[in-house]
Amino acid sequence: MLQGQLSFEEFTTENPSQSVDLTHANDGSGRIFVVEKGGTIWIYDQDGNRTTAPFLDISGRVRNAGERGLLGLAFHPNFANNGFFFVNYVNRIGSDGQTIVARYTASGNAASASSEVILLTIDQPYNNHNGGQIHFGPQDGYLYISTGDGGSGGDPGNRAQSLTSMHGKLLRIDVSTAANPTAPGYSIPSDNPFASSAGLDEIWSFGLRNPWRFSFDEVSGDLWIGDVGQSTREEINHTQNLPGINFGWKCREGFLPYNGCTGSGFTDP
């Protein structure tokens, strides 16, 4: 089978500052949205020209230190009509901050910080391993959220394997307003693996260390997760987007047992 050819076109931006994510709104506008870790989102045209004012500025809410900051952006599949988009950031509450997943509403090339509706708040026990990516599933339209194991090193709380912790997970929620028009602003898809059993309803898969970035194959729906390793292996996990997958941390790092763990039932990278 012949492999397809891939080409790249250089995209030069002006005055980037800690850019951590880049996406589009899928609204036919051709706009490119660049996320800066300090708490701003800018719009660029396809020639690399930036708007004079940011699309969103929540720098006053964001803790920009180490791995923390504004980390993810996803546009609602119906953004062209409802103006909804979602962000993932670490706030300034407490010594290590909280992960916030929030919805905002855009009007034209701007979104007011006052339009924030907070969907999820996850306390962070340490100052690292925050995950941060968010995407809508191309086949189900649900919002997926990656979370790190809570930090330090070696997952001292074994949070990634715990089904009562949101850390070290891929979460999956339904943010359609029809599903739940009131707080908390989302509902649980009925086919989430722990929706009717022990474990947090929001969990889709688990056993992740710091899934800083993930994405979907838009055609097949397959899931690709980049998971930061402890000391010997980095991971790229590629699977069908199936419920309840255990990616192994902190029992496995890549293909290797971690710290003498001999568990089973893990999906290797």
Model-derived regions, located:
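Acidic, Gly/Ser/Thr-rich repeat motifs that build Ca2+-stabilized beta-propeller blades
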Residues: 1-154, 213-229, 267
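Beta-propeller domain segments
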Residues: 27, 35-38, 60, 68-70, ...
